[in-house]
Every structure is written in C-alpha cells, then in structure tokens.
Amino acid sequence: MASTDTTTTEDAAVKDAAQDLAGLEAGLDALDAVRVSRTPVRQVLAQKVLPPVAAVALVLIVWQILIWAKVTDDYKLPSPTQVWDEVSNAWAQGTLLGYIWTSISRGLFGFLLALVIGTPLGLLVARVKVVRAAIGPVLSGLQSLPSVAWVPPAVLWLGLNDKMMYAVILLGAVPSIANGLVAGVDQIPPLHLRAGQTLGATGLRGTWHIVLPASLPGYLAGLKQGWAFSWRSLMAAEIIASSPDLGVGLGQLLEQGRETSSMSTVFLAIFLILIVGIAIDLLIFSPLERWVLRSRGLLVKN
C-alpha cells in the first residue's frame, strides 16, 4: 500500500512539473510574440501610407528633372505627363480596365489550376521517398528554367489561344508551389507526425489535420513564388504570342508600344504590371501571412 501511495505521489509530481513547464513555455512564447495593437489612423498614415507616397513622389521628381535636363531624346524617355495622358486616353476609351482584367483573369485562373496540381504533387513528393527520388530533381530543374522558354513549344503544341497561356503558367508555377510545400513538410518536427499517428491521424486525415497546417510557412512561401512565376510567365506569353483572337492584355499592350515606338505606352504597361503585382501581394498574400503568424502565436492581437 505504501508503495502504491508513493507511486501515485510521484506521478502527481511529474504531472505538476509537466504542467508547470508547459505554462512556462506558453508564457515565454507570449513574451516573445510580437504584439499587434490597434494604432491610430494618424499613425497608420504616417508609418504605412506616407513613406511609399513620398518614394513615388521622389521618383516622379527625379524623372521630371531628367526630362528638363534632356539627358536623352524625348522619344526614348517620355515625361510623367505623357504617361498620364496615356492613362487618361485609355480610361476615356474604356480600354484601361479591359487591359487589366484580361491579364488578371488569365493569371488568377492559371494560378488556381497550378494550385490544384502543385499541392497534391508536392505532398506526394514530400511523403513518398520513391517519388521524391524520381521527380524531386526534375521539379527543382523546372523551377530554375526561365518560363519564357516554354512559350515557343506551347505555341507549336497548342496554337495561339488561351490554352497556350495556361500551359505556360502551369509550367512556371507548379514546380514552385510543389517545392514550397516539400520544404514546408521537411521542416515539420518528427515528434508532431508521430503524435498525430498515435492519435489516429493517418492517411488523408493526417495530411489534412497535421501535415498541411504544420507546413504552412513553407507552403505559403511556395504560393507567393508560384504567383510571381505565374504572373511573369503570363507576361512573357502575352508579349511573344500576340493575336487578335486573344484580346489585349498588359503583355500585348507592352508589345504594341514597342511596335509603334510609343515609349509612353510601354511605360504605361510596365506601371500597370507592377501595380497589379503589388495589389495581389497586399490583398491576398500579406493577409495570409498575418493569419499564419497569428495562428502560430507569433502575432498577438490585443
């Protein structure tokens, strides 16, 4: 009886120590976490809005100074007002939003296709050793291959149509998404996987509840890179493969400016491509990153 009481006391002590250790770790994690509090509107404007606005204003000032200094011929470097006139004309003609929507719709649809293909492919490569040995190096090689290299064969295989555009996007984005997920899975502590298996989270259930949530940082990095590759692949395809049947996207607009020697049109297309890329990052990927950080206790919202 005394031995049983001693064992019970020791078990209780071990359990209390484990709880104390868990509480200590939770407290340390809370101290290390970055606290996010609601900031005043004036502070947000000063810290988040004013710096990029000032940077854009500085670029415009330097640009205009170069125009006044006549560092090059007018047809090589248009003035800011000439580019703005292009924006105004495109808006007045009702074509500005059409240029943007044509490219965005293609890019987002192609990226969603790449997501549907790249996610299971990445899981397969990460979890099956034979598959990783067989196609892992191929995925890495495809990721380093410039996406513009796929445009000529895609045109020959599929012709000048939207299928060709989507094929180029897939070939550029799928390897990045798959490799990002593989990197995320490789960073999962083995203890988490064993704990999930012990609790019965195996197969698809383990993948959904353990593997995917634990691999989110690497997966999200792969998604961001996959979108960047999708957007660049699409622009390359639109520039090289122009056809009246395809409509006019931002890449075709850039190529039209080159064909007509209109640098103001070229600059307009470049700025629109840049703005769309920034907008997608701010509206989609930045909120996703904050959500992942907050879910992992790296951001604490007061």
Language-model features: where?
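Glycine-rich helix-loop "coupling/hinge" segments at transmembrane-helix boundaries
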Residues: L156-W157, S233-M263, F267, L272, ...
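Periplasmic/extracellular loop-to-transmembrane helix junction in inner-membrane transport proteins
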Residues: V36-V44, A69-L112, Q252, Q256
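Transmembrane-helix boundary motif in ABC transporter permease subunits
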Residues: F109-L139
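N-terminal signal-anchor transmembrane alpha helix
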Residues: Q43-V71
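Transmembrane alpha-helical segments of polytopic membrane transport and secretion proteins
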Residues: M1-A54, L282-N302
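Generic hydrophobic transmembrane alpha-helix motif, especially the helices
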Residues: S140-S176, A183-G184
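Transmembrane alpha-helices
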Residues: A167-L171, L204-A237, L268
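Short cytoplasmic-facing helical segments at TM-TM junctions of multi-pass membrane proteins
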Residues: G180-G222
